[in-house]
Amino acid sequence: MERELALEIVRVTELAALASAPWMGRGDKNSADGAATSAMRAMFDSVSIRGTVVIGEGEMDEAPMLYIGEEVGSLNGPEVDVAVDPLEGTEIVAKGLNNAMSVIAVAGKGQLLHAPDMYMEKLAFGPALVGKLSITDPMEVTLKKAADALNKKVSDLTVMILDRARHEALVKVLRKVGVRIKFLSDGDVAGAMAPAFPEAGIDLYVGSGGAPEGVLAAAALKCLDGELQARLMPADGNEYNRCVEMGIEDPYRVLTMDDMIGTGDVIFAATGVTPGEFLGGVRYLSDQRAETHSIVMRAKTKTIRFIRTLHYLPNKTMLSSGLEMAVSGSKE
């Protein structure tokens, strides 16, 4: 993949973020997601790839665009797998909370795991813990290993986990051991990435979340020299069979980084919609301008770019009427 592709991809996440940001705090997650999806799909036409969506908005009969198997890009350029989440954290945007972002990962053809839409158990951590932890260990053992490797007391560890009822038993274990817990209302990809950013102050990300989001997070962590280990959690026979149909012969086995994103190059881009652990959100400025804050990374070179971009909104012709609502509001 050419290095110029990284900047092409981040322009796509920027537009999706700008499209969804006007819906922040309006209680309408479907409109926010729809705006991001429409903008992302339109912008993909200008990207120099022959891409196939392997993680997207659902199956062909479930989503009008960015569905699994859809071809995207200008169809001139390298053949690649594409994983997208136009709006990671739809509920976050609807409620005006933190950590929503627009996300894309691109890898060579056949690299990305076709993750089924089900829960996945996850253990994510930064470079200092790579190769030292196993998702198969009891949580108490994992925390002790992490503390030893980081030269900390167990009670000084900070663990991030989604605030969900299904995590009640796991939270009890974390409380018993005595670690600090930072609950995340939503935003599974951002949560799994957080341990790789020292400024976030997170040592581990644990618990279960969406399998497609796990692949996106693994792509990011490869660029950040972190690691994500995972296990699919099929809820019934139908979900188990779905895994097998998608080529995962043993759905319960541990999935490594190589299983999820392959051994080749990966490009990851994300643009903040609302402020988060490591990205700022969309900010509306005077004179019909807006500022976005993005990250774009490439595994091959380990280059990590944080990009602040000023946009003149009337020139964003691909944006929907939702943006016009925000623009008119900024003039009042």
Where are these regions (language model features)?
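N-terminal subdomain of lithium-sensitive/metallo-dependent phosphomonoesterases centered on the IMPase/IPPase/PAP
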Residues: 1-83, 144, 148, 189-190, ...
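A short glycine/serine-rich beta->alpha loop
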Residues: 3-7, 27, 91, 130-132, ...
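Short capping/connector residues at structural and topological boundaries
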Residues: 71, 97, 106, 128-130, ...
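DPxDG-like acidic metal-binding loop motif
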Residues: 77-88, 92-111
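A short local loop/turn or secondary-structure capping micro-motif enriched for an aromatic residue
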Residues: 101-102, 122, 313-316
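Flexible glycine-/small-residue-enriched beta->alpha junction loops
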Residues: 107-134
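An extended, acidic
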Residues: 136-289, 293-298, 308
